[in-house]
């Protein structure tokens, strides 16, 4: 309900310039995009993709920068207390190759990463892979595992997205002789993110009855 968008915008929704913005779903459509302040953000590629974590405090990018290994690499940025974002950090050679990585999607566990790549061995010109974050630097990952021929085709596959339940995914795929379509696929246990519990509610100060701000514990 809150998609990230390429470019920044004026208050009348006309395009302002390069960057990242975010819109929100409303009862009547979509809000005017809100420009996101990201430290030293730039992208040397004409394409970019973003994904925000379930708690909206982590943002992943597929962009090309001076420290990229090849074309676009995967980067991570973290929300700061003032509402701005840290400078995008390259997620390392465990996931990035000397060609193109794209369409990152972070599972609700904040550990399981799905992404597309033309650099890792696959069935077509771009396949979807899964990897697990091993520690908190966001640069150490398990060996990316190809999602297999049930999901990946001899052509192009990308934009893998799953809900918090983790039972199924939506994927964009190009089959031989056709254009790109969206497909729904059910996930085996090996392809699911770690289970998480999402609890909604308010924690109030016993005396003032005012909300207490806190980070969720996993």
Sequence positions of predicted segments:
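Short, conserved micro-motifs composed of acidic
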Residues: 1-202, 206-213
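Short amphipathic beta-strand segments in non-cytosolic proteins
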Residues: 215-218
């Amino acid at each position: 309900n809150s998609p990230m968008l390429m470019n920044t915008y004026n208050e009348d929704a006309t395009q302002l310039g390069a960057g990242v913005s975010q819109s929100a779903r409303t009862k009547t459509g979509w809000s005017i995009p809100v420009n996101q302040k990201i430290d030293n953000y730039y992208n040397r590629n004409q394409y970019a993709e973003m994904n925000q974590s379930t708690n909206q405090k982590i943002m992943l990018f597929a962009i090309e920068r001076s420290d990229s290994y090849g074309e676009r690499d995967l980067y991570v940025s973290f929300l700061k207390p003032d509402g701005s974002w840290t400078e995008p950090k390259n997620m390392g050679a465990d996931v990035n190759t000397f060609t193109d990585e794209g369409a990152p999607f972070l599972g609700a566990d904040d550990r399981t990463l799905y992404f597309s790549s033309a650099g890792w061995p696959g069935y077509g010109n771009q396949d979807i892979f899964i990897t697990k974050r091993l520690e908190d630097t966001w640069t150490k990952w398990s060996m990316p595992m190809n999602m297999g021929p049930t999901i990946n085709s001899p052509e192009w596959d990308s934009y893998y997205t799953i809900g918090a339940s983790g039972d199924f995914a939506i994927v964009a795929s190009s089959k031989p002789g056709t254009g790109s379509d969206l497909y729904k696929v059910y996930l085996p246990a090996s392809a699911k993110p770690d289970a998480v519990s999402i609890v909604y509610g308010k924690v109030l100060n016993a005396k003032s009855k005012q909300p207490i701000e806190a980070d969720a514990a996993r």
